[in-house]
């Protein structure tokens, strides 16, 4: 059916009066609960001197539930996956077109991310990211972190490594220069779109 202009205004008005605030409140609550419980579990495991690597997937599985609500509140209702993941690939590469890319990838797969070192200085975000066993890289140093990435790729007990080879968020209209770290190994690299 064709909607007239005043129907559209009514829809927008009702969204801002009713649905918008509810989604915003749910978004904030889901993020706070996710952070609180995840950080609490990690703190308890560290206090008990437990190996965090043994419980990493359990913690991420718990966080997925709350992050799924978070994504739903942002309007991401379904994540469609086509094709198969190559279990032999140690690296996955993807263009970084939005700030939600890592959260969406965590919903699909257990991954370890290559992340800029600045994120290790943000208190709550740092604690949440550490659950994924990230590799922090310093952009000011052009080399040196490649060895860390390769050594983590060689450890088959660890999760596959997700790299955004452009190293930053871009709009997807053009390609930036790729960092070579994932391509310097003999391991398979799986592209993700």
Residue ranges of model-derived segments:
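Extended, low-complexity, polar regulatory segments
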Residues: 1-6
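Catalytic core of membrane glycerolipid acyltransferases/transacylases, capturing the structured
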Residues: 35-65, 71-74, 84-143
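Conserved Motif II region of HX4D acyltransferases
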Residues: 88-93, 113, 148-193
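Generic structural "secondary-structure junction" signal
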Residues: 21, 121, 139, 171, ...
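Hydrophobic alpha-helical transmembrane segments of integral membrane proteins
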Residues: 12-49
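Eukaryotic beta-rich interaction modules
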Residues: 7, 15-23, 60-61, 71-80, ...
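Eukaryotic intrinsically disordered and solvent-exposed regulatory patches
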Residues: 77-80, 98-101, 122, 147-151, ...
């Amino acid at each position: 059916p064709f909607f007239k202009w005043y129907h559209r205004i009514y829809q927008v008005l009702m969204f801002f009066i009713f649905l918008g605030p509810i989604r915003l409140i749910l978004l904030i609550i889901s993020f706070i609960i996710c952070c609180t419980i995840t950080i609490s579990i990690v703190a308890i495991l560290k206090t008990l001197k437990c190996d965090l690597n043994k419980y990493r997937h359990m913690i991420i599985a718990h966080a997925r539930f709350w992050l799924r609500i978070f994504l739903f509140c942002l309007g991401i209702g379904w994540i469609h996956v086509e094709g198969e993941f190559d279990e032999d690939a140690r690296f996955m590469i993807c263009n970084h077109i939005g700030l939600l890319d890592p959260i969406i990838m965590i919903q699909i797969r257990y991954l370890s991310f290559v992340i800029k070192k600045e994120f290790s200085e943000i208190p709550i975000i740092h604690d949440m990211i550490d659950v994924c066993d990230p590799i922090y890289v310093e952009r000011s140093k052009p080399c040196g972190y490649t060895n860390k990435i390769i050594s983590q790729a060689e450890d088959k007990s660890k999760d596959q490594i997700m790299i955004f080879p452009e190293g930053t968020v871009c709009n997807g209209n053009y390609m930036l220069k790729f960092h070579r770290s994932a391509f310097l190994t003999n391991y398979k690299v799986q592209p993700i779109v």
